[in-house]
Structure formats: structure tokens, C-alpha cells
């Protein structure tokens, strides 16, 4: 699509003076780096407030109760619980859309192409978990519950760093890191479901299964309207929440039922859009705005309907959720969960096996696991490096994969529920490990000067298959 130029805009005189500023502001919010910056600012704000005279207010906000009631039905939870078990379901739903897209038509479709990413992800999960477990065994028994913390990669942070690096990072690095993060997150979701679920209520689980079956039936029968999946998704979330399985699993499961086929074929789109366009050009009166031309407005609405019927729900819904999740939900999650009071004597934190285990696993575990498994996969002939990627880039990517902020905080809150001291130590370990991994990875990309031939690509794709430009 051609970029909208100033000459093509309908602007009032005052608007023209601010147009450049507004366009820059819009581009900033479209940038992949913006999500990382927003997430980072939320985490910093939480840390600053938690270590200031306002720390009591921060705790009060986190534990403030919010209730929903309808007749005799009522549900009440703290803000912390609503965020972790409620809002984060949308993040996991978006993650599920990404996973489904990548497995069907993306980088994970062909095993030959995806085998390297899968090997890297396996190494990036096994080694961190093993290193953490080895360190945790020297401490209290409860410390071992955090073995899943260093396994996942924070997609928003890692890709945001690559976006800030610009031409210093090859184009294929973002594609590889994105696919790696998705496989990592698949592993983390499995870990949450299998190892961080305690009491299972089979009746609620059965209702959840029936609801999920109903969502798949809607897909098979050709229902495409969001309202059906919204209602079904809310019911699924409620039953999963009552079953004892973590409620965010409902987001992943609901995403798997989202339709991947449009209502209409591309030939129908071309024919009808051409007809609408011809009528629009024929009836357009240059001396009047579209506000004064109701028939033109109706033609534009027809074009929107035609486009909606020819695009897939999995891509359309992913596009709608992408910015709100990245710029609102994840920063709220970071603000509520990242705040932890630093000890008066910071040197004491190095006596904590949880802190040492998490930080070392996120840095050393990711780097060693991903790099070694990638080297074995390539040298054995089982996999091949993507165009434009050298082993130096793989090593740098392995460092960035150690940035595990969002999912790591999430797993820590599950693993150390009821153990506030261990949870605080884990949070500090996550922050320290993520910062160290980000610094090392960024430095390595800046140092790598060897350029590998990179075959041109028509377009890249980001979350849920959305077109991604160089500005993203």
C-alpha cells in the first residue's frame, strides 16, 4: 500500500500545523520498539514506587478488591488476580493466534525450515531449567519450584531490541527470534498446565472441554462473527478458572478454535472491489467532502465489508488485539508484578539460590543451550541456517532470548505463590538476568561486522501473520 502523503490528506488549516507531529506520534506507536519501551517504563515505575515512601500505596492498589455481580452471581478478586488471571488471557489468546498461524503457514510449517528453531528452543528450555535446578538443590526445598522461570523468552522485549538495532541486525534475525520465542512460549504454556496446576476439579474441566468443543463446532459450521467466539471464550475462561488449571490456558485453547478461512475467495474480492472503486470514481465530486456525499460514504462502507469478508479472522483479530495487548495489558501486568523492595544490603541477594539460579539460567543457560543445540543441528545436516544469519548472530540471538521478563514473572507468581520472600528473590533474578542478557546480546550485534548474503523477501510477518514493515 502506498504511504499516505500530505497532499492526499484532508486537513483543516490548524491540523496542517500539527500534522508532522501527529504523524511522528502515530509512527512511534506503530513501532515494535514502542512495546518494549512501554513495558520497560512500567517495570521501572513499579520498582521505583516499591522502593519509595509510596510502597504501601503500591501494595494496596495491587490487593484492592474488584467485584462483578449479576443477581445472585458474584465474583470478587484483587486487582493482581484480575490482571494475572483475567487480562493476561488476552495476551495468551494473541499468543495462541501466533502459534496457530506459524504452524499452518508461517516459519513452523515446514519441518526442514523449523527444525533449527525447534532445536534452539529445546536447548533454550532444557539448559536453563537444568542450571536453575542444579543451583536450587543447594537451597531450601521450595526453591526448586521455580525451575520453569528461566525457560521462556519475552517476545516484545527481544524484538524491540532488534528493532532499535536497525541494520545492525539482519532481517532474518527477527524472523528466527520471533519463531524461537513462540516455540519457547509453547513450552512455557505446557509447563504451566502440567507442573504448576495443583487441584483439578473434573466437573469444571468437563464443562471446559464441552465449551471448547462448541467453539470448534462453530468454526466447522462456518461461523465467523466475533461475538460467538467472545461469548464462548468467556465461558471457557470461567470453567477453566474453576477447574484448577490456570485460567490463561483458556486463551491458548480459544485461539486454536479461531477460523483460518475467510467468507469469500480472492476472485470475489477483486471483482466486487473493482466495481465499488469504479462507482466511487464515477460519482466522486471533487468540490465536496465525503461528509456531503452520502452515496460515496456508503460505497466506502461496502469496501470495508468486502475486505472483512475476504480476510481471515485469525489475522484480523490478531491485528485488532496486537496494539492493546502490547501497549496496555502487558505494561499493566509489568507494573502490578515487577514491583519488589530491594534489601537494605544488596550484597545479601547473592546469598539467595533463587536469585543466582534465575539470573545465571537466563544468561548462561539460554546462551549455551541455544548456541550448542543450533550448532549440533546445523553441523549434523539436520537443519540449516537461514539466509543472512551466521553463527555469530545465533550466539547474539541466544543472549537476547535470555530476556524472559513477562512469562518469567508469570511463572514465578505461580511457582512461589505463598512464598513472598522467594518470589521477591525470583523477581530480582528475572530483572537482573534480563538486563544482563539484553546488554550482552545488543553489544554482540553491534560488534558483528561480517555480513552474510541475504536473499530479498517480499515481506515479513509479525504476530499472527500481520505484514511487518521496516518501521516495525
Swiss-Prot record:
It is found in: Cell inner membrane. Coiled coil: none annotated. Gene3D superfamilies: Na+/H+ antiporter like domain (1.20.1530.10). GO terms for biological process: regulation of pH. GO terms for molecular function: sodium:proton antiporter activity. It catalyses: Na(+)(in) + 2 H(+)(out) = Na(+)(out) + 2 H(+)(in). Keywords: Antiport, Cell inner membrane, Cell membrane, Ion transport, Membrane, Sodium, Sodium transport, Transmembrane, Transmembrane helix, Transport. One of its GO terms (cellular component) is plasma membrane. It holds the Pfam family Na_H_antiport_1. Its main location: membrane. Na(+)/H(+) antiporter that extrudes sodium in exchange for external protons. PANTHER family: NA(+)_H(+) ANTIPORTER NHAA, SODIUM ION/PROTON ANTIPORTER NHAA-RELATED. Belongs to the NhaA Na(+)/H(+) (TC 2.A.33) antiporter family. This is Na(+)/H(+) antiporter NhaA 1. It comes from Pseudoalteromonas atlantica (strain T6c / ATCC BAA-1087).
Amino acid at each position: 500500500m502506498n504511504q499516505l502523503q500530505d497532499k492526499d490528506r484532508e486537513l483543516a488549516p490548524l491540523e496542517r500545523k500539527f500534522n508532522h507531529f501527529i504523524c511522528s506520534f502515530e509512527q512511534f506507536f506503530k513501532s515494535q520498539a514502542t512495546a518494549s519501551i512501554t513495558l520497560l517504563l512500567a517495570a521501572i515505575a513499579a520498582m521505583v514506587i516499591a522502593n519509595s515512601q509510596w510502597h504501601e500505596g503500591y501494595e494496596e492498589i495491587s490487593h484492592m478488591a474488584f467485584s462483578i455481580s449479576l443477581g445472585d452471581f458474584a465474583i470478587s478478586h484483587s486487582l493482581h488476580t484480575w490482571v494475572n488471571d483475567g487480562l493476561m488471557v488476552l495476551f495468551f489468546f494473541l499468543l495462541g493466534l501466533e502459534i496457530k498461524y506459524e504452524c499452518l503457514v508461517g516459519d513452523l510449517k515446514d519441518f526442514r525450515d523449523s527444525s533449527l528453531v525447534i532445536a534452539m528452543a529445546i536447548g533454550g528450555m532444557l539448559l536453563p531449567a537444568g542450571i536453575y535446578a542444579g543451583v536450587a538443590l543447594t537451597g531450601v526445598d521450595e526453591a526448586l519450584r521455580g525451575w520453569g522461570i528461566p525457560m521462556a523468552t519475552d517476545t516484545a522485549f527481544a524484538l524491540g531490541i532488534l528493532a532499535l538495532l536497525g541494520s545492525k541486525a539482519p532481517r532474518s534475525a527477527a524472523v528466527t527470534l520471533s519463531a524461537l520465542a513462540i516455540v519457547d512460549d509453547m513450552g512455557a504454556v505446557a509447563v504451566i498446565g502440567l507442573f504448576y496446576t495443583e487441584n483439578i476439579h473434573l466437573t469444571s474441566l468437563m464443562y471446559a472441554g464441552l465449551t471448547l468443543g462448541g467453539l470448534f463446532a462453530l468454526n466447522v459450521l462456518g461461523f465467523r462473527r466475533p461475538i460467538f467466539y467472545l461469548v464462548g471464550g468467556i465461558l471457557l475462561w470461567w470453567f477453566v478458572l474453576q477447574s484448577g488449571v490456570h485460567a490463561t490456558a483458556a486463551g491458548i485453547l480459544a485461539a486454536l478454535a479461531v477460523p483460518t478461512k475467510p467468507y469469500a475467495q480472492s476472485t470475489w474480492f477483486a471483482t466486487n472491489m473493482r466495481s465499488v472503486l469504479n462507482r466511487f470514481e464515477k460519482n466522486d465530486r471533487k468540490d465536496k467532502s465525503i461528509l456531503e456525499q452520502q452515496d460515496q460514504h456508503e460505497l466506502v462502507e461496502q469496501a470495508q465489508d468486502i475486505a472483512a469478508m475476504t480476510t481471515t479472522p485469525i489475522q484480523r483479530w490478531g491485528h485488532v488485539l496486537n496494539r492493546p495487548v502490547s501497549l496496555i495489558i502487558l505494561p499493566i501486568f509489568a507494573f502490578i508484578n515487577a514491583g519488589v523492595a530491594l534489601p537494605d544490603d544488596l550484597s545479601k541477594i547473592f546469598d539467595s539460590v533463587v536469585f543466582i539460579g534465575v539470573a545465571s539460567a537466563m544468561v548462561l543457560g539460554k546462551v549455551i543451550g541455544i548456541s550448542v543445540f543450533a550448532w549440533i543441528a546445523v553441523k549434523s545436516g539436520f537443519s540449516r541456517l537461514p539466509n543472512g544469519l551466521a553463527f555469530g548472530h545465533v550466539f547474539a540471538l541466544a543472549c537476547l532470548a535470555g530476556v524472559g521478563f513477562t512469562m518469567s514473572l508469570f511463572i514465578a507468581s505461580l511457582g512461589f505463590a505463598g512464598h513472598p520472600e522467594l518470589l521477591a528473590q525470583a523477581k530480582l533474578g528475572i530483572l537482573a538476568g534480563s538486563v544482563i542478557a539484553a546488554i550482552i546480546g545488543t553489544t554482540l550485534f553491534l560488534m558483528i561486522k561480517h555480513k552474510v548474503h541475504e536473499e530479498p523477501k517480499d515481506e515479513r510477518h509479525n504476530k499472527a501473520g500481520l505484514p511487518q514493515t521496516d518501521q516495525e
